[in-house]
Curated annotation (Swiss-Prot):
One Gene Ontology term, aspect cellular component: cytosol
tRNA processing among keywords: no
Residues that bind Mg(2+): 150, 180, 182
SUPFAM superfamilies: Thiamin diphosphate-binding fold (THDP-binding), TK C-terminal domain-like
Residues the record lists as binding thiamine diphosphate: 62, 109-111, 151, 180, 252, 423
Keyword check for Translocase: no
InterPro entries: THDP-binding, Transketo_C/PFOR_II, Transketolase-like_C_2, Transketolase-like_Pyr-bd, Transketolase_bac-like, Transketolase_BS, Transketolase_fam, Transketolase_N
Protein name: Transketolase
Amino acid sequence: MKNLFACQHLALSAIQHAKGGHVGMALGASPILYTLWTKHIQFNPNCPKWINRDRLVMSAGHGSMALYPILHFAGLITKQEMLHHKYGQVNTSSHPEYAPNNFIDASTGPLGQGLGMAVGMALTQRVLAAEFKALSPKLFDHFTYVVVGDGDLQEGVSYEVAHLAGVYQLNKLIVLHDSNRVQMDSVVRDVSLENLQTRFTNMGWNYLETSDAVADIDAAIKQAKKSDKPTFIEVHTTIAKNTTLEDQPAGHWFIPTDKDFARFNSNTKTNFTPFEYPQTVYDFFHKQVIARQAKPVQAYKELLEKLKDKPLYTKFINWTENDYQALYLNQLDERKVAQANAATRNYLKDFLGQINNSNSNLYCLNADVARSCNIKLGDDNLHTNPHSRNIQVGIREFGMSTIMNGMALHGGVKVMGGTFLAFADYSKPAIRLGALMNLPTFYVYTHDSYQVGGDGPTHQPYDQLPMLRAIENVQVWRPCDEKETAAGVNYGLLSQDQTNVLILTRQALPSLEQSDSVQTLKGGYIISNRKQPDVIVAASGSEVQLALQLEQALNEQQLKTRVVSVPNINMLLSQPQSYLQQLFDPNSVLLTLEASASMEWYALAKYVKKHTHLGAFSFGESNDGQVVYEHKGFNVTNLLKLIKTLKS
């Protein structure tokens, strides 16, 4: 037990040095992490993101100090990093932060999402094992472990993803519950009457229960590994164990005092000095955590050597190295669409059809709207075909998005998902977290404006684009036709470290001769030009056709007009100033159009003499889409009035 107590003492020391932290779980869940790392987790100490490593997600991210001491004693985190817990150190941040070269498998903190990401990882292990079984069944035989707290299980998303794990029988997913019966403001029984055994068995899980003794946790994990279902292990722990706030809500977060160290030393019969521990502790963890990995890592290396000449090996390398250039470059032909002058969502179907082959590692998740959004590859699904690229998640948008993050974190697959734009709110917490981790997830949101029409204001998403565009590292594309759609799809497929969001229409839009897929990648470009224009009209998506209609009307009034298509306003604003000055003339007036509440358009005002913007700033109504659209001011007559005011 001395080595476990050393971990707990180091956690106390680091939290005290940081002037406070989540002591409760750091001590209570420590036996869970200790058991996992010293007896079960397989990984490659020299390759943190080894593709066949066991994954560990701290869904209850505030319990990070149950993990960091183990990594320190194993030689994977330095003493300096422990001394700077919470202050400028990615590897010992307050909540775990994923990085390409560290031993953290997911950034966590927003409760519930870690469980969803773990489900995504286990799901990816399942589909990759099936895809490469013919090459070797040992290529993807790892487990996914996730540590959850009571808060994780109270979040609604935990129900969404746990249900799906049961549906898909993800038997290599093992959840360990830090069940201490206490949370920050209350005891659990004050806010939850749930029987966890009933909950998880009803969802198709294996349920186990154990004490926090290392031997008991170890036995439960061994039993879970033999299950043909995902396993939920409820580990009965004690919050802030062996401190003055043991078993109390106040033990969730506090600054350890000398009395806490005295209580800890007395109860554990130890007398450690903060940040100074016997060499025997380091030796133990090196043997049990590091040296234990040599045999499985070497066996995997030898396996790959034997497979190098096999037909599937190149595909295996392209997938596991996330070589999107090899998989998707030059795969799309913008000219090959079933029908021109169509809704942009229809073009997505055309382009996905072009890459629907065995070499593609794209997997499509859909929230029960595949037929409406065209987010699908072929007509089968994972239930009927283990090699299918279509994963049904039901009406679980938030869960779907956390699973997408987990799949991207696992690696080996490209993942696309989406629904109607009005329901992007359900996914935003996961989009934000994925962007924070630089994950190349790909979202498609359709039914993008007032022109949804008869479904009414609940389905008319005037307010969604500004929220998506406000998230750092998210590229939002709103194309006006098939060429711009092809550019957005291609960019999203090739992206290595950015989240991409493609915004598509339900209503048909004209195919434009002047549009350009190459220029689209600049975020904006001149689609109809007049030198020294009197008026410049810039627009995105469905408003580009309106801008071109306005151009005709202005030409009749002898006003020289330039039209700029802006499929990605944030990307346009990131271009060099010299490029923006080519598009926008300082002697011209500028009208910008978008059926959205986005504010980014006002950043273009400094490049022109005068500017006004027509956006969408109120709920719509249940009516014909074009009627609603025009009622909100998106008609040539109203735009001419705006231009007249601008020119006055």
